[in-house]
UniProtKB/Swiss-Prot annotation:
Subcellular location: Cytoplasm
Region (Disordered): 332-352
A cellular component term, taken from the record's GO annotations: cytosol
Taxonomic source organism: Pseudarthrobacter chlorophenolicus (strain ATCC 700700 / DSM 12829 / CIP 107037 / JCM 12360 / KCTC 9906 / NCIMB 13794 / A6)
Encoding gene per record: recA
SMART domains in the cross-refs: AAA
Full protein name: Protein RecA
Amino acid sequence: MAAAPDRAKALEAALAQIDKQFGKGSVMRLGDEVRAPIEVIPTGSIALDVALGIGGLPRGRVIEIYGPESSGKTTVALHAVANAQRAGGIAAFIDAEHALDPDYAAKLGVDTDALLVSQPDTGEQALEIMDMLVGSGSLDIVVIDSVAALVPRAEIEGDMGDSHVGLQARLMSQALRKITGRLSQTKTTAIFINQLREKIGVFFGSPETTTGGKALKFYASVRIDVRRIQTLKEGADSVGNRTKAKIVKNKMAPPFKIAEFDIIYGQGISREGGIIDMGVEHGIIKKSGSWFTYDGDQLGQGMENSRRFLRDNPELAAELERLIKEKLGVGVKPADAESKEDSPKLKAVDGF
């Protein structure tokens, strides 16, 4: 083995050669610079933001949202788009299913006039458009709805009944190899919405799997399993769904956390309902019988009245959301993190 000084000299020479050939900073020591906090895009549900561990969806990463039909996958993605736009970001929606409802998106807070929308004919076209948009460096978030609808050109141009084994999986693998690096460089969040299929002949374990092969499972930094668990009713009328989201994979924080939130028909995720649920759970909002109170003031009798009160008082809703995140250590800004010796060094900022 070479002497320690010789090894150090050889390493410095190699680093100098790499910097000369590939540019300054191509290789660096992790301790040379202070790591920046993780930038996030809020999901619209405080419970889901907390379950993700960093206060939202990480920027510059691949996210997969999957689940059964009508479980709320697109709703979660559209809320993230709306939050990115509110922070001044530019969003794109690759509508491979040709099923985007602009009116519903607008009700969720999406600026549909500014939203970039593409309805591609083939999977190759969809992913090429995405690659060009991300490569521009101007995009903040892009949604692909859905992976199952990214049909390879050969399958579209072929006859019904032709076998096209593995074409979509190869297409996804090639695209993700190419796109992942650009997403990180441009800090663009890519949300892939995916559907469930059942594997034939599975007797042990879950037969469910997602479409598009295994590449997306590997490249995704966060995978969220979204399920509808209950129908919300007012009298005899159905007004929404209770939804459960499980963080199946998380490279940014501990995985397997579960969040529950309400999706109201025509309105999307109930932000105010989530604040009340989390506030009660963590002792910030008091519940006595059917009454909800905060700091001695009554919010309302029953969940619906309390929701309405917070909707009419957005400043109070924002204050409660901030208190919940502070108590749970999620969404702490760098200045706050530095002032607390016991606080973890890596914390998410609240947006951009």
